[in-house]
Amino acid sequence: MNQEEFARRIETVRKKLYKTAFLYLGNETLALDAVDEAVYKALCSYKKLRELDYFETWITRILINECYNEQRRQKRFGGFEELPETAAEEFDSLPLKEAIKKLPKELKDVIILRYFTGYTLSETAELLKIPQGTAATRQRKALKLLKLELGEEVSE
């Protein structure tokens, strides 16, 4: 893969990457920064990618790691509260979003990747580097906790 092909592949997944980062970080600016950092890291090491078929999985894994790094930075430096800049940020106050934030990290990861980013169960397992059965179990546990938290029916 050369740089032109790398750029073309990035353009095909950029929106999905942003959506994933936004769901992890809950902030437009942080999400854009995380995507940029992930793309930069991928650009620096794209020649190490052995299977081009796994490009999307590979870049998404880099992005998730970058989101984790940003979350750690926010905890360490005590992120600041911002007023919503756009109507889309009002989504942060929705009960589902709040319930998802309360989930343990390993359950939240599965829910974000499965239901908000659209990955299959096997792709989710691959991205999280866990067996598919473990991903399915975490999905069931997360849905059960969300159902309890929201007090309503959550479909599988």
Summary of predicted features, one role per range:
Residues 1-19:
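A short, charge-rich alpha-helical start-of-domain segment used by transcription regulators
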Residues 4-6, 78-81, 126, 143-156:
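C-terminal edge and immediately downstream basic/flexible tail or linker adjoining helix-turn-helix-like DNA-binding
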Residues 18, 28-45:
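Conserved RNAP core-binding helix
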Residues 37-54, 73-75:
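Sigma70-family region 2
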Residues 48-50, 61-80:
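Arg/Lys-rich amphipathic alpha helix in sigma70-family domain 2
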Residues 64, 68, 128-152:
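DNA-recognition helix of helix-turn-helix
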Residues 69, 76-100, 120, 155:
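Internal acidic/polar
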Residues 110-114:
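A short pre-motif secondary-structure segment
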